[in-house]
Amino acid sequence: MEKTQSVFIRFIVNGSLVKQILIGLVAGIVLALVSTPAAIAVGLLGSLFVGALKAVAPVLVLMLVIASIANHKKGQKTSIRPILFLYVLGTFSAALVAVVVSFIYPSTLILVAESADITPPSGIVEVLHGLLNSIIANPIHALLNANYIGILAWAVGLGIALRHAADTTKALINDMSDAVTLVVRVVIRFAPLGIFGLVASTIAATGFGALQLYAQLLVVLIGCMLLVALVVNPLIVYWKIRRNPYPLVFACLRESGVTAFFTRSSAANIPVNMEMCKKMNLNEDTYSISIPLGATINMAGAAITITVLTLAAVHTLGITVDLPTALLLSVVAAICACGASGVAGGSLLLIPLACSMFGIPNDVAMQVVGVGFIIGVLQDSAETALNSSTDVLFTAAVCQAEDAKLANPDPLAAGKSV
């Protein structure tokens, strides 16, 4: 009996989060079919989970950005600027693709919001005015009211100032960042229970139409990611290496993307990417920096997630978006994506920042985050696969172009697969 309990506890604490979320998803559907009152009652679990996310997200953004900027090392001579440019170009292109696809195939979410609470901006001028006012907000006020734009502004400013701090101070900042990340991981471990409550109460209240809407949203998300992985990224790589990019693209998807799909963490996939770069005989001084950096800031998949879910919320609430505002959303989504920082589900926690552009209240934005967690079993896995495989793809493209030595048609021909 004790052995059985030990195995069960080990599965709950250390088991696969993907499997647990799937179990919660199925259990929520079954409960909604069996007992509508019970399904509505367990909606409390979903509310508590979303509330915990709402509480921890502002602190997470603040500490991750401060730690990242404060610990940037000077004097590292590498050819990283071209790779950094590709990271930025790829992330912005992904957000742009997501905007276009979302306009062609708009998605609708099940949200609980009163139209009186929504004050949409009239155009790009009002959006910029709101952004500027958000930037100069009091930092404590920004944290209390989940003003993510103000939080980002203060985090960047403090991070730059703390780059000149003593090593002990930087170590303390790193420890604080790690502590907040640990809290986030603990909260996310409760995702199966939260999703169980969200799915059960949603189906009980709205019927299976909600799942069909989420299925459409998932198709749009995965479709955008496939479009970026198989069309946009190859075009960028071809522009850099001037030859058929698909052998390199497919090698990166095969060697890096598959493992990242299951780990659901760009940071956890860094050793795999490092080994792949080594087998392709790339410049070690370059990839030893670009791969960890890419795990933090190269977030094409996150940009897609933020953009698609934000525009889905906008469409659901009936807010009209003009072209300049949509382009600005692409920029904001690309910047937001850089804050995902390799944490599983991290991009979902940054959706409220993009939603704030359109006057969407934080409570409604966190409902969008809840929707993201419902579809996150596939969404987060596909997002991480795109993010991590793009790290090694762009690093290899720049290294091969700058070495002026084009590799064999199969970039891993000289060595076996990882």
Swiss-Prot record:
Bilayer topology annotation: Multi-pass membrane protein
Localization of this protein: Cell inner membrane
Protein's UniProt keywords contain Transport: yes
InterPro entries: Na-dicarboxylate_symporter (IPR001991), Na:dicarbo_symporter_sf (IPR036458), Ser_Thr_transp_SstT (IPR023025)
Gene Ontology cellular component list: plasma membrane
TM region positions: 21-41, 49-69, 83-103, 142-162, 190-210, 217-237, 299-319, 331-351
Name assigned to this protein: Serine/threonine transporter SstT
The species this protein was found in: Yersinia pestis
Encoding gene per record: sstT
